Amino acid sequence: MRSALKSTVVLLIALMAAACSNGGGASPSASAGATASAAIAASPSTAESVAPSASPNACAKDTLTTVTAGKLTVGTDNPAYPPYFQIPDGTATKPWELGDPTNGQGFESAFAYAVADKLGFAKTDVAWIVVPFDNSFAPGAKKFDIDVNQVSYKPERAQAVDLSDGYYTLNQSIVALKANKIASAKTIADLKAYKFGAQTGTTSLDTINNVIAPTAAAKVYSSNDDAIAGLKAKQIDGLVVDLPTAFYVTAAQVDNSVIVGQFAPPTGTDAEHFSVVLAKSSPLTACVNAAIAALKSDGTLDSITKEWLADKASAPVIQP
């Protein structure tokens, strides 16, 4: 989310990176020569959860069909928001703003390079392109091989594109100004009378409508930047975003703001998770799922998560 106070963003991003790091340095990954064959071998059960044809030979780099031969093209939105994409040294490669996907810094940047590594692609063989959020899961041909951009799995999205197995389980949350009475809310019942806003087409908006169900209709914004501006202008009492984004908003984008709380998934329901986006029926889907399974199995994904994302336990939970 693009900050109106860009002059402060670089310093604050650096502070956040230090606060969320488990010790700094590059996140652990498989060896540079690792291939999808190794990924599948590292997780024998993976083949049962992906397409039956996902064999080691089928996922060897030389057999993969990609947009550009020998390259893995990865899409994400611009600005590339922290904590998913970071610029600890304050320098971003054009055209990227706020965060830089190309440097391997930040949760999703590190994750994307780890997936690429499992598929046999060196960092120099990964090409990043700008893909607006809504476009990533819209029907039609894709200019990317994979898209990594905080896209939550939804059945309706899966009708138009392939969505991978989850790589991060998340909770939605509320950000408010400290001076607003909503800041003391503890339960969903406490939230009913307030006005909420979120970006269009997001699971954050779904949370307002289906979980909070306030008396006033949600205010829908075209982007998170606009939603943040609405919070600052007091058009809304609460901004609903995923929890990692909430940590960034309160630390770097909205002065005197607070995380009111996060929503735990209702008992008996599946937790929300981020998925990699691929073209419908992509030949890479099974191999990407195998790579994700291997990253979970060997501990790489857990290490990346701990390095770049704040502990969920540090935010209060809104009670039913």
Model-predicted regions and their roles:
Residues C20-A32:
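Bacterial lipoprotein signal-peptidase II cleavage site
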Residues A47-A54, F111, K118, K195, ...:
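Extended ligand-binding regions for polar small-molecule ligands
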Residues T124-D190:
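Acidic, polar ligand-binding/catalytic clefts
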